[in-house]
Every structure is written in C-alpha cells, then in structure tokens.
Amino acid sequence: MADVLDEVYAVIADRKVNPKEGSYTTSLYNHRKGIDKVLEKIGEESTELIIAAKNGGEKEIVSECADLFFHAMVLLAAKDIPFEKIKEEFERRRK
C-alpha cells in the first residue's frame, strides 16, 4: 500500500514543478487563493469524511478518506515536505 501512496505523492510533487494543463492538482497549485485553496479543500474533505462516518457506509468513508489523504499530500508537496517524513513519523510513533 505504501507503494501506491508513494506513487501518488510523486505525481502530486511533479505537478508542482511540471504543471500539466487540465490537471486537478495543477489547478490547486495555480489557484488565485494559493495555499488557502488547498487548506479549504482539506477542511471540506474533513467535513465530508465526518459526515460519511456518521451517515454513510464503508464505500463513502473510504472515498472521503482517500480525498482527505490526497489533499493532505498536496499540502505536503506545496510546503516541500517529502512524504517520507510522514512515514518516518509513523515509524517513530510505532516504537
């Protein structure tokens, strides 16, 4: 599973330095609100996950959780924080 997350993060980070027309990720980086747009999306996806957890089924929860993970990864890349740092933090907490 970590491999697919690494791959997704690599694409997200690449879109920052190599924008691609029509890319949703590129549109987040280039939004007129800047990082605030990414933060808005994180807030929105967090709320949607909470609602899915309260009222939805497994499929909705998984979908909203993936959306939240994705936008958190965009934030990391926007702030030049490697995804590896998150994995290291989980490793540290596991000990």
From Swiss-Prot:
Annotated signal peptide: none
GO cellular component: cytoplasm
Protein name: Phosphoribosyl-ATP pyrophosphatase
Subcellular location: Cytoplasm
InterPro entries, alphabetized: HisE, PRib-ATP_PPHydrolase-like
Keyword list, A-Z: Amino-acid biosynthesis, ATP-binding, Cytoplasm, Histidine biosynthesis, Hydrolase, Nucleotide-binding
Catalysis performed (reactions): 1-(5-phospho-beta-D-ribosyl)-ATP + H2O = 1-(5-phospho-beta-D-ribosyl)-5'-AMP + diphosphate + H(+)
GO BP, sorted A to Z: L-histidine biosynthetic process
Family label: Belongs to the PRA-PH family.
Record HAMAP family: HisE (MF_01020)
